[in-house]
């Protein structure tokens, strides 16, 4: 009996020592939208937990706010337009943000009109007032890129209102501002359901492939936690594989 107990004790101790404690990671997302479905699938299907990550998801409501959370340490990882990391580098931040994984490669927003338009073309925006995005943000830059592709000068041929906070443009449009608005889901569908607007074009279809939304972390975090960065990417890939299957 004594021999049996001695045999079991080391085994029990070994199991306890090998039990891994999940790494806590705070992720700040730029917005909460079905556009980012693979990430939510990875969360709901437990892929982050499988990779040893205890994930907390926070919505920043704008890339500027998400990047601020990342740089101040409120978030470990930020999910936003890839342009934001360039701004931190150019701005001279010593511990700048670095993109390490990409989720979306097209614009995920839509042109919403006040009336149905069966055969929309971007030249219909000439002379109109459009509720756009934050200056220098990926949604606004891609929208202007599309306009230029269609020989439309964003600064001369139409009026783009960039004064409204991200996430508030749909409410402003419902309140009577603008002839068109550029909206992500679920706001585009919500406008249609209320009868306040009609989706007439997909910016993702018009833009082609672009490095639209990516995950980033501070340079120091990536250096100090390479295993966490890889585990996070693994979980994300599982979510992408699931949604594409």
Model-derived regions, located:
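Short, catalytically relevant binding-site loops at active-site mouths
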Residues: 187-188, 205-207, 221-222, 239
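Short, glycine-/small- and polar/acidic-enriched structural segments
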Residues: 19-165, 172, 179-186, 196, ...
């Amino acid at each position: 009996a004594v021999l049996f107990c001695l045999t079991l004790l080391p085994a029990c101790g070994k199991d306890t020592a090998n039990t891994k404690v999940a790494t806590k990671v705070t992720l700040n997302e730029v917005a909460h939208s079905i556009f980012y479905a693979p990430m939510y699938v990875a969360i709901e299907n437990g892929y982050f937990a499988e990779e040893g990550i205890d994930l907390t998801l926070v919505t920043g409501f704008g890339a500027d706010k998400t990047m601020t959370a990342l740089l101040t340490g409120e978030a470990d990882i930020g999910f936003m337009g890839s342009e934001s990391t360039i701004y931190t580098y150019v701005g001279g931040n010593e511990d700048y943000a670095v993109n390490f994984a990409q989720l979306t490669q097209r614009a995920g927003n839509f042109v919403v009109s006040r009336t149905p338009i069966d055969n929309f073309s971007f030249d219909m925006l000439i002379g109109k007032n459009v509720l756009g995005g934050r200056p220098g943000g990926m949604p606004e830059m891609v929208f202007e890129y599309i306009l230029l592709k269609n020989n439309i000068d964003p600064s001369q041929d139409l009026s783009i209102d960039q004064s409204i906070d991200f996430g508030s443009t749909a409410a402003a449009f419902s309140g009577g501002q603008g002839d068109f608005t550029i909206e992500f889901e679920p706001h585009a569908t919500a406008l249609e359901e209320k009868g306040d607007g009609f989706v007439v074009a997909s910016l993702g279809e018009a833009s082609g492939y672009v490095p639209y939304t990516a995950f980033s972390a501070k340079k120091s975090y990536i250096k100090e936690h390479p295993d966490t960065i890889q585990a996070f990417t693994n979980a994300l890939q599982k979510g992408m594989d699931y949604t594409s299957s």
